Regions:
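Bacterial N-terminal signal peptides that target proteins for export
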Residues: 2-11
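Bacterial N-terminal signal peptides
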Residues: 10-21
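Low-complexity, acidic/polar, glycine-enriched regions of mature
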Residues: 23-214
Length: 214
């Protein structure tokens, strides 16, 4: 009888210890404060334009997209992408007038997902054989509170006009500077009136890009 009473006293304690041990072994460990998480914080620490060093930056085509959108019969926004984009950015954080940007686009690289239609757009819409480059240049870039209005000259279809690119500064990290940009203009101002009004006259350009410091 004495041994039975002792066992009844010990058994609940053993069960409690076993339960705690199992729970502890199945609890996932907390991730260490290293690797991607630490690197991410380091990247975000340089969101101030003043922290980016002056110099010449080259557009990274692998981290750049230029997309054009225009309404089709007011039913949807038809989307064009350009696959061949190059450019450079001379940056001076202490003087906006000393900063400038240039972007070049090959109109033959237009991509709608339909190669036959791409060729038609390049020839009839852009007249790419006659005008082989779409060029945007600006000699004054001023970033304030993460945003900038970059007024530059768009050379498109043989016509040069001022276009404002509204940009958001994404930050500087590991020799890279990132921007998002948007501009809207009338293509008829540049002599491109093919398919108006079936295809809208207003064109919106969306740019996502990174520049790498040389």
């Amino acid at each position: 009888m004495t041994s039975r009473i002792a066992w009844n006293s010990i058994l609940p304690a053993l069960l409690a210890i076993t339960t705690i041990s199992v729970a502890a072994s199945t609890t996932p460990p907390k991730p260490e404060d290293t690797g991607a998480a630490a690197q991410y914080r380091q990247l975000n620490a340089t969101a101030d334009p003043g922290a980016a060093p002056a110099g010449t930056y080259k557009l990274d085509p692998h981290h750049t997209s230029v997309i054009a959108k225009l309404a089709h019969m007011d039913l949807s926004r038809y989307t064009l992408r350009f696959d061949d984009v190059s450019g450079s950015f001379d940056f001076n954080p202490s003087g906006a007038s000393a900063s400038n940007v240039e972007i070049n686009i090959d109109p033959k690289s237009v991509d709608t997902g339909d190669r036959a239609f791409d060729k038609r757009i390049a020839s009839k819409f852009f007249e790419a054989e006659k005008y082989p480059t779409i060029n945007f240049t600006a000699d004054s870039v001023k970033i304030m509170n993460g945003h900038a209005s970059v007024a530059g000259i768009l050379n498109f279809h043989g016509v040069k006009k001022t276009v404002v690119l509204h940009t958001t500064y994404r930050g500087f990290a590991q020799s890279r500077m990132g921007f998002s940009g948007e501009a809207t203009f009338k293509r008829s101002d540049f002599g491109v009136s093919e398919w108006v009004p079936l295809e809208a006259d207003d064109v919106t350009i969306l740019v996502e890009t990174e520049f790498t410091r040389l």
